[in-house]
């Protein structure tokens, strides 16, 4: 069976008779500079490097129409000659009478002028004559008070005097200030004139010293800079240690000044009690003087007060070599702390707050409320806990001191009343009767 028989069975149309053209696959053009054999070896793989082909720059595709520009001449109004410049502007914006748009930035400075009469009355100076002063003011107008340019252009040979930048500034501002004060007294000046007068302040000596100081700073060597930084750090350390030492000293003196007697005022009524009080005061003053001398003669700022108290003062203490102590591991900056007692298990730091007497707890809470401090720590860190305990102890000490003062004042008041009654009755019969009742 042939293919024609099969087509007859399935009633298929006969095949079209004609030459079919094969579809040609598009071939890429071989680039210049590569041989045909080498290019055929590449196959479908592209070249590893882009091949540069010389061609002209493509013309930009602009969708809108090009704008027309015109080269227009313009003049500067601040110039008195006929000097003309040109610039490019849009043809639609061409205006022969329009001013130059950057002309608004050409603002001349206000420089005071003076007359011959004003110079003779107010501006005479032994070191400056009128011609040189006029020359200085002309340069200031020409160079808009740019004193570095003025000092560079200044003709020192003409007047046979070497003028520094500070000399030129001092002469200009002193003349301007004198003229302004002569024309407008201070009492009748406006706000603008007062502001202008304040801007004319110039201290020549201060500027000279400042520039010398800056020159000295700029001429330092790296070794000198490092030494100054080390000295500054050492100064900060000494100031910190000195502040801590003074606070410890005040605390020790406060402890030494505390009264030792708790028996009330009755123990000082007799001569023996008064003698004991005077002796205690003398001993307290001697102890205070010894502590101050020991602290002053101490050579180590970071040694603390305890070492000062434990070390006796000797006459040859100043001749002993000074010992310089370095940083200790227990300094706060290293973050190392030593706990006095470790509690077993987990505990809250607020549990370590010392308990207050029941008679004082309510008063302590009221004082802390007046100070705006909560009686319960919100964030009980180590520093907050320490400050809170310190505040609580200070309040307790204050309340105890107030109680003693009130008690002493009451006893004093009673003694005053008794003394007045005794003085009222010579024999003291009324006072004895009053006491017996």
Curated annotation (Swiss-Prot):
Q: Which Pfam families match?
A: SANT_DAMP1_like (PF16282)
Report the superkingdom from the record: Eukaryota
Q: Which GO terms label this protein's molecular function in UniProt?
A: DNA binding; transcription corepressor activity
Keyword list, A-Z: Activator, Chromatin regulator, DNA damage, DNA repair, Nucleus, Transcription, Transcription regulation
Kindly give the InterPro entries that the UniProt entry links to this protein: DAMP1_SANT-like (IPR032563), SANT/Myb (IPR001005), Swc4/Dmap1 (IPR027109)
Q: GO terms for biological process? A: DNA repair; negative regulation of transcription by RNA polymerase II; transcription initiation-coupled chromatin remodeling
CC annotations in GO: NuA4 histone acetyltransferase complex; nucleus; Swr1 complex
Question: Subcellular location, in the record's words?
Answer: Nucleus
Q: Which Gene3D superfamilies match?
A: Homeodomain-like (1.10.10.60)
Composition bias (Basic and acidic residues) maps to 1-10, 408-418
Q: Which residues form the SANT domain?
A: 125-176
Q: Does the keyword DNA damage apply?
A: yes
Q: Where is this region: Disordered?
A: 1-33, 302-328, 408-437
Q: What does the UniProt function comment say about this protein?
A: Component of the SWR1 complex which mediates the ATP-dependent exchange of histone H2A for the H2A variant HZT1 leading to transcriptional regulation of selected genes by chromatin remodeling. Component of the NuA4 histone acetyltransferase complex which is involved in transcriptional activation of selected genes principally by acetylation of nucleosomal histone H4 and H2A. The NuA4 complex is also involved in DNA repair.
UniProt record similarity statement? Belongs to the SWC4 family.
Subunit record text: Component of the SWR1 chromatin-remodeling complex and of the NuA4 histone acetyltransferase complex.
Name of the protein in question: SWR1-complex protein 4
Provenance organism? Schizosaccharomyces pombe (strain 972 / ATCC 24843)
């Amino acid at each position: 069976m042939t293919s024609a028989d099969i087509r007859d069975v399935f009633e298929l149309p006969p095949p079209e008779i004609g030459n079919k053209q094969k579809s040609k696959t598009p071939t890429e053009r071989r680039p210049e500079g590569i041989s045909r054999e080498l290019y055929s070896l590449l196959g479908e793989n592209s070249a590893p490097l882009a091949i540069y082909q010389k061609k002209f720059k493509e013309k930009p595709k602009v969708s809108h129409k090009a704008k027309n520009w015109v080269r227009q001449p313009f003049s500067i109004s601040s110039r008195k000659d006929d000097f003309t410049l040109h610039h490019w502007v849009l043809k639609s914006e061409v205006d022969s009478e329009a001013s130059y748009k950057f002309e608004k930035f050409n603002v001349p400075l206000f420089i005071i002028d003076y007359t011959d009469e004003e110079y003779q009355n107010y501006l005479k100076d032994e070191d400056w004559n009128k011609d040189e002063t006029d020359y200085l003011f002309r340069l200031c107008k020409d160079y808009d008070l740019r004193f570095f340019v003025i000092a560079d252009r200044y003709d020192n040979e003409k007047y046979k005097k070497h003028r520094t930048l500070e000399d030129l500034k001092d002469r200009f501002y002193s003349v301007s200030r004198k003229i302004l004060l002569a024309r407008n007294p201070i009492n009748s000046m406006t706000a603008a004139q007062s502001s202008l007068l304040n801007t004319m302040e110039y201290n020549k000596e201060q500027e000279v010293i400042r520039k010398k100081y800056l020159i000295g700073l700029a001429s330092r060597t790296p070794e000198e800079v490092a030494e100054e930084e080390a000295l500054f750090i050492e100064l900060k350390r000494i100031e910190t240690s000195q502040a801590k030492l003074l606070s410890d000293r005040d605390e020790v003196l406060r402890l030494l000044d505390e009264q030792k007697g708790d028996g009330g005022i009755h123990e000082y009524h007799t001569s023996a009690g008064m003698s004991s009080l005077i002796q205690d005061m003398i001993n307290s003053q001697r102890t205070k003087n010894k502590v101050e001398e020991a602290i002053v003669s101490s050579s180590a700022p970071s040694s603390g007060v305890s070492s000062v108290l434990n070390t006796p003062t000797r006459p040859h203490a100043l001749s002993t070599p000074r010992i310089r102590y370095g940083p200790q591991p227990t300094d706060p900056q290293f973050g190392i702390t030593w706990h006095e007692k470790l509690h077993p298990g987990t505990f809250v730091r607020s549990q370590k707050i010392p308990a207050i007497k029941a008679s004082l707890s309510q008063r302590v809470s009221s004082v802390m409320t007046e100070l705006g401090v909560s009686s319960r720590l919100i964030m009980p860190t180590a520093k907050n806990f320490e400050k809170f305990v310190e505040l609580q102890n200070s309040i307790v000490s204050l309340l105890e001191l107030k109680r003693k003062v009130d008690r002493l004042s009451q006893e004093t008041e009673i003694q005053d009343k008794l003394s007045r009654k005794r003085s009222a009755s010579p024999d003291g019969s009324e006072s004895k009767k009053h006491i017996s009742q």
